[in-house]
Every structure is written in structure tokens, then in C-alpha cells.
């Protein structure tokens, strides 16, 4: 996609491939891909050679649930907002991108919010800091859509100012029963829309005169879900609503790709695993609202051991900066191995987003989304030193620290210049002098 950088060879490092064990040796990044991994790798001409003695290399971290780059994430005026898309309102200058890079995040699933039973379209992005939003899109990644169950869509329907209590007014639904009904009714309509287009296409193929159905931007993404062309990421907490959504999907013949948060997933892990649905959860958040009261820090480990592809996500710009340490908690709470813990933020979210052929592990031919640490990534004392995406270096800890004095000096100079300009124009906005009193006198 972008001009190729010079090859990068990291030597004498501990390489955590995640899927193929641990290698003591070298890794070569070339032409945006992982070119070689082995005990000894020769440096090609023009390569940047890095001594990785005492250091660790691992795949870039993937966050399956993020809202960075977006400000207004909920189109909460309707219960089904599948016609809107988060990809059209992303801010590539959000400083949270750079901070996520500093914590090793290279890819994120940017989601619509959880105010709607069926929310807006989602998109997978690479943290290519300094690029425009289009250039940050993960090329070829499947599109998604956000669903939400429980308190959030209920609250949006019957909050203060919108009726005040369930059943007294405001936007439907106001109960968990209503949330299920909204989803079922939407897919009833989607199946009708799908059938109308199928009938039109069949007549057209036979050479018959046919009038195409009116295009419906709300229904199109749901038809894509029915046809397996769009992934469903569903916000949920309680075991009853988790089972409800799985049963709805069974009835209408579509797949729930990931259950997001899924704090009571440990109670119904077998049912989740049977359907091949993934779980993207917090490490140890609990009791921050009523439906989170039964959350336990063993959730990720239990789900993993029951055969559910499980990831740890952030849902928060600050938490996103230390997802590696969040994953490490599953070693204490549940006894996961170091490789299983790393998988929670690498290969597992890659599988959930269906991008594991490109990222999520260190394998020859995969994208060169690579992290260099000064120690074991699962240690609280280890720090990210460098981050590469597609073989291009997007973060260097030493350069960041060394450059801070100049940044502060530049910032101070700009503030001084702006203040002087404001004084010269009288301090008013737009260059006009400030006035007092009634301007009509």
C-alpha cells in the first residue's frame, strides 16, 4: 500500500511467535512482511540491524473493541441504526492512536456504540499514525456491525427526558423483551428485502421485465449478515440475554461472530463454544453497573478452557495502552499459560476479526506488525521500545523521550506567538477589538 521501508533485522532476541513456539534468534522484516525467522538470519543489503539481546519480539496487539478516533459513537435516535457507519466519521489525529501505539496496539476494531439494539457499521483499522483515515483502514478486512443487549439499549429507550421509565414513552424498546423483538423484527424485514431482490435478480437473469426493489440502506447491512458478508459484534453482559441472542441467530440462520464484554459468558461457555462464537471480554472489570455484578476475573480463562476463542479488549482509550498486562492477569486468574495469555490480545482477536491470515502471530509471509520489548511482555516492568506496522516504524520510545524537550519548547513558542497576536488585535475573536455595553447605543 505504501512505499517500502528499508529491511529491518532484529538479532539475538527472544521471539514469541504465539502460534509456533519461542525462537531464540532473529526476525527479518522486508517489503512490509515478515520475511524470515530463525536462529541466524543474514542481513540483506541496506538493512537496519537491531541488537535484540535481552529483548523480546512479539506480534502487534489487536484490540477487538475500541472507540478511539470517534467522538459521537451512538446514533441513538432510533432502535435500528444499521444504515450509519463509524468509518465515515473517524479522526486520524486522535492522540489516542499514538498512545495506543506506545502500548503496542497495531490494529483495532472500531465500533459504533451500544445505545441501539442494532447499531451502526464497524471497521477494522491499523494504527498508522500520521496517515489519513482512509490509509489507516485494514485492507480486505471484513466489515462488521454492532448489536447491543441489556441496560444500554433499554436506558436509551426509557431514560430521563425520553419517558423516564419503561413503558411510559420514549424510544422503543425499554425492556430486554423489547430488545429481542427489535432484533427479530429487523431480520423479518431483512429477509423480505432479501427475497425481493432475489426475485428481481432471478427475473432479470431470465430476460424478463422486472422493476428493482427500492434500495434500503437500513436493510442492506442486515442482508449482508444473513449472507455471511458482515460480522456481528454484540454488546452483552448477562447469561439470559446471551442465550437469547444465540437463539435468535439460530432462528434466522446467521452467525454471531463475537460477544462483546460477555461478563457472564463463563455461565454459558458451552453454548457459546457450540456455535463457534467468540468472546471479547475485560480482564477483571466488575460491578460498575448492575448487569456487571456477576463478573469474575476467571471469565477469560474459563471461556478459553471451554473452547471459546477469547480475547481481552479495552473499550477504553486508557486501558488500550496496557492490554498486554490485562492479558497477563489471566495467568493468575485461571492459570493460562504465557502463550495462551498472549493469544488473548494477538491471534485470538485476529481470528475474531477474520484477519488471522495477515496478523496475530509472527509467521513468514504475514504483515510485519511487530513489537520490540525491553523484557517479557507479560511483566508489569516491561516496556514497548519500538512498533512496526507493515514494516514501517511508527513508534520509538527513545525518540519519543528525547524529543519531548523540543516539543515543549515548540509548544511554548506557539502559545507566546498566539498571545502576542491576540494582544495586537485587542483580544477579541476574529481580530476585532473586544467591546462592552449595548452595541446598539
For each feature predicted by the language model, list its residue ranges.
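Extracellular/periplasmic ectodomains of large secreted or surface enzymes and adhesion receptors
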Residues: 5, 305, 386-441
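Metal-associated gating/positioning segment near the N- to mid-region
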Residues: 52-123, 131
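Divalent metal-coordination and catalytic microenvironments
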Residues: 13, 32, 54, 65, ...
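C-terminal cap of metal-dependent C-N hydrolases
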Residues: 13, 363-407
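Active-site gating loops and adjacent loop-to-helix segments of metal-dependent hydrolytic enzymes
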Residues: 74-90, 131, 148, 153-160, ...
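Histidine-rich, glycine-flanked metal-binding segment
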Residues: 15, 19-58
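Polyanionic/metal-chelating signatures
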Residues: 101-256, 260, 383, 389, ...
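His/Asp/Glu-enriched, well-ordered alpha-helical/loop segment
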Residues: 72-75, 79-84, 231, 270-273, ...
Amino acid at each position: 500500500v505504501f512505499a517500502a521501508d528499508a529491511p529491518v533485522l532484529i538479532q539475538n532476541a527472544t521471539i514469541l511467535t504465539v502460534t509456533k513456539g519461542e525462537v531464540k534468534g532473529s526476525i527479518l522484516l522486508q517489503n512490509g512482511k515478515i520475511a524470515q525467522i530463525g536462529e541466524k538470519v543474514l542481513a540483506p543489503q541496506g538493512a537496519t540491524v537491531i541488537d535484540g539481546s535481552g529483548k523480546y519480539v512479539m506480534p502487534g496487539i489487536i484490540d477487538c473493541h475500541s472507540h478511539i478516533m470517534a467522538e459521537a459513537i451512538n446514533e441513538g435516535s432510533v432502535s435500528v441504526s444499521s444504515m450509519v457507519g463509524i468509518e465515515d466519521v473517524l479522526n486520524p489525529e486522535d492522540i489516542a492512536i499514538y498512545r495506543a501505539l506506545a502500548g503496542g496496539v497495531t490494529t483495532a476494531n472500531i465500533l459504533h456504540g451500544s445505545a441501539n439494539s442494532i447499531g451502526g457499521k464497524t471497521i477494522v483499522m491499523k494504527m498508522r499514525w500520521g496517515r489519513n483515515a482512509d490509509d489507516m483502514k485494514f485492507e480486505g478486512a471484513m466489515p462488521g456491525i454492532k448489536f447491543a443487549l441489556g441496560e444500554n439499549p433499554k436506558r436509551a429507550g426509557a431514560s430521563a427526558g425520553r419517558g423516564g421509565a419503561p413503558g411510559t414513552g420514549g424510544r422503543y424498546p425499554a425492556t430486554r423483551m423489547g430488545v429481542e423483538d427489535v432484533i427479530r423484527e429487523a431480520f423479518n424485514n431483512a429477509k423480505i428485502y432479501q427475497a425481493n431482490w432475489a426475485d428481481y435478480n432471478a427475473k432479470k437473469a431470465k430476460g424478463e421485465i422486472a422493476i428493482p426493489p427500492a434500495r434500503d440502506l437500513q436493510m442492506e447491512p442486515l442482508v449482508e449478515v444473513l449472507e455471511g458478508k458482515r460480522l456481528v459484534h454484540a454488546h452483552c453482559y448477562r447469561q439470559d440475554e446471551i442465550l437469547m441472542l444465540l437463539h435468535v441467530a439460530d432462528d434466522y440462520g446467521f452467525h454471531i461472530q463475537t460477544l462483546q464484554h460477555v461478563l457472564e459468558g463463563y455461565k454459558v461457555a458451552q453454548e457459546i463454544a457450540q456455535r463457534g462464537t467468540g468472546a471479547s471480554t475485560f480482564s477483571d472489570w466488575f460491578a460498575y453497573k448492575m448487569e456487571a455484578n456477576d463478573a469474575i476475573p476467571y471469565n477469560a480463562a474459563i471461556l478459553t478452557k471451554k473452547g471459546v476463542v477469547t480475547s481481552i479488549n479495552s473499550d477504553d482509550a486508557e486501558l488500550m495502552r496496557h492490554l498486554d498486562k490485562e492479558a497477563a492477569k489471566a495467568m493468575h486468574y485461571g492459570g493460562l499459560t504465557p502463550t495462551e495469555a498472549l493469544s488473548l490480545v494477538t491471534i485470538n482477536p485476529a481470528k475474531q476479526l477474520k484477519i488471522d491470515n495477515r496478523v496475530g502471530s509472527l509467521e513468514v509471509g504475514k504483515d510485519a506488525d511487530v513489537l520490540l520489548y525491553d523484557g517479557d511482555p507479560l511483566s508489569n516492568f516491561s516496556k514497548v521500545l519500538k512498533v512496526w506496522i507493515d514494516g514501517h516504524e511508527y513508534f520509538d520510545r527513545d525518540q519519543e523521550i528525547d524529543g519531548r524537550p523540543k516539543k515543549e519548547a515548540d509548544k511554548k513558542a506557539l502559545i507566546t506567538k498566539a498571545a502576542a497576536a491576540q494582544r495586537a488585535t485587542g483580544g477579541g475573536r476574529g481580530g476585532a477589538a473586544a467591546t462592552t455595553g449595548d452595541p446598539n447605543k
